[in-house]
């Protein structure tokens, strides 16, 4: 038999949020150099489920996607079923490429600055085909259908802020290590139509994947979900028992709240869903939002932190919470962040 005849077919999974890009990749890859496209996915969450179901030989991955981005996908895939991944990346986002390689990607292909992907077809085929030369054993051993409950992080931080919050949150999220076994949910008092851009700004300076929350988003380590302006954000479990974000309209049933998003509602939901696995952190802001919610987290056995007058732009909310006696530690912003990291890393933390 010829060498060509002995060459095994490689099954490819394409993960890209653009339908046009997915279609083009299928056309370019399918049948080329012994490759067949076994499936496609529109975001990281769907891609992870398909990778575990289809057990492809190689994944072609876009990094910038909604819901679950490529970085979170890589972390979870390499933990569950290590698979060769070829990243498609914009030339203007070189740092993203190196981050992806650090997370386990095999190689990358730079997208053409204009036009379609045809100019890089041969490069894509070649880099996917290099999988044949890799010494990767037992990739499918133990692989099984995705149970999203297995992705639930060991610790979850719920963070509330108002006046002065954008800068404080940017500083806090920038200091969190990317491999921390922690998910973060944020309620920042901010009008509608601003929180999407705010999440993008936070993401640019953070090792975490930071996105505006969408109802039903998985809560996973290395990811921060920002409450959409004009909506409440809570933690909830469906009938399947999976921990997800619930995005609720202003009039949704529940304790009355002056602000939307409500810090109290987010904190109370963390107390109900997580108990001692939750940390509530109340940052700078005016008023009393978060005061009752932080007391609920304390009563459920979670860790409660508030920003001290030393660094808070407005000390109103942290002070109101501290006066209830429900705050475990009143700390400057950097010390508060360090305590949060310690909490995430210590499985025995309260």
From Swiss-Prot:
Please give the start and end residues of each transmembrane region.
none
Name where it's found: Cytoplasm
The terms under GO molecular function for this entry are: phosphorelay response regulator activity; protein-glutamate methylesterase activity; protein-glutamine glutaminase activity
Provide the E.C. number(s) assigned to this enzyme: 3.1.1.61, 3.5.1.44
- In this chain the Response regulatory domain maps to 11-126
Q: How is it modified after translation?
A: Phosphorylated by CheA. Phosphorylation of the N-terminal regulatory domain activates the methylesterase activity.
Q: Which reaction does it catalyse?
A: [protein]-L-glutamate 5-O-methyl ester + H2O = L-glutamyl-[protein] + methanol + H(+); L-glutaminyl-[protein] + H2O = L-glutamyl-[protein] + NH4(+)
The record describes the protein's role as: Involved in chemotaxis. Part of a chemotaxis signal transduction system that modulates chemotaxis in response to various stimuli. Catalyzes the demethylation of specific methylglutamate residues introduced into the chemoreceptors (methyl-accepting chemotaxis proteins or MCP) by CheR. Also mediates the irreversible deamidation of specific glutamine residues to glutamic acid.
Tell me its family.
Belongs to the CheB family.
Q: What is this protein called?
A: Protein-glutamate methylesterase/protein-glutamine glutaminase 6
Species the sequence originates in: Anaeromyxobacter dehalogenans (strain 2CP-C)
